């Protein structure tokens, strides 16, 4: 059974990266005898995210992501991060004026989203999907993968949907293209039209262009970015990956961010 109701709230302080104002919501369920059955506490924020003429806006003002891809990884403990390590990560990001994180390439620990709510970090929440090396085969248009993909999408959405920090749902990473991504896109938009859907794989097959509300690319040159924006102003452009710290790389970052477009 599902039920919906609305409670008007006046004179709220809006949530943003600069001013991450939060409120405590308490939901109490009573039985017919007025006995408490369940109490839920939720940390919530009020904000309006919109896309206007290809420009992302939060609370009516243009926003630009200065972001990173973040893996849940520690050199000593592997993928088992402590809460203290997550807090350390968030403090490092804020000290570097980073305002956005893509949860590459899977949903993160639930505590991470609470920190992003509290400290004002925009989140691209990414599904646990990557078929690197086999993305020309899996999942593509194959119906045998659809239920599995939708199960992962639902799990992420239902767990994370109330976080004000999440501005986009991401369909995964380097998993090719195909009709399954249109199905995933439509699922998220049906559940949550207030957020955008992100997927870089549309650049591999323009047949499914509408699977992403964002023109997302990897390692494009600044010249290519400018050329796209001049020719295709409808979608916002995002470099979901543009620097990689393998070996002796990770230089020349300034040319990607010094000239806003």
Language model regions located:
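Substrate-binding/catalytic cleft of secreted carbohydrate-active enzymes
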Residues: 90-93, 100-258
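Secreted/periplasmic carbohydrate-active enzymes, especially glycoside hydrolases
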Residues: 1-123, 151-152, 162-168, 184, ...
């Amino acid at each position: 059974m599902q039920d919906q109701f609305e409670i008007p709230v006046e004179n709220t302080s809006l949530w943003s990266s600069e001013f991450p104002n939060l409120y405590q919501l308490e939901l109490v369920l009573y039985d017919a005898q007025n006995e408490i059955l369940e109490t839920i506490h939720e940390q919530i924020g009020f904000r309006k995210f919109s896309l206007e003429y290809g420009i992302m806006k939060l609370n009516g003002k243009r926003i630009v992501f200065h972001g990173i891809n973040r893996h849940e990884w520690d050199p000593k403990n592997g993928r088992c991060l402590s809460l203290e390590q997550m807090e350390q990560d968030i403090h490092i990001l804020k000290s570097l004026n980073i305002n956005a994180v893509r949860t590459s390439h899977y949903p993160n620990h639930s505590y991470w989203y609470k920190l992003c709510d509290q400290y004002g970090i925009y989140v691209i929440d990414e599904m646990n999907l990557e078929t690197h090396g086999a993305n020309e085969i899996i999942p593509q248009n194959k119906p045998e993968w659809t239920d599995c993909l939708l199960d992962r999408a639902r799990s992420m959405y239902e767990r994370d949907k109330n976080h004000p920090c999440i501005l986009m749902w991401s369909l995964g990473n380097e998993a090719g293209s195909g009709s399954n991504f249109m199905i995933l896109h439509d699922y998220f938009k049906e559940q949550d039209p207030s957020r955008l859907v992100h997927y870089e794989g549309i650049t591999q097959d323009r047949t499914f262009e509408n699977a992403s509300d964002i023109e997302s690319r990897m390692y494009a040159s600044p010249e290519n970015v400018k050329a796209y924006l001049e020719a295709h102003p409808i979608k916002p452009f995002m470099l979901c990956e543009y620097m990689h710290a393998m070996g002796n790389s990770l230089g020349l970052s300034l040319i990607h961010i010094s000239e806003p477009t």
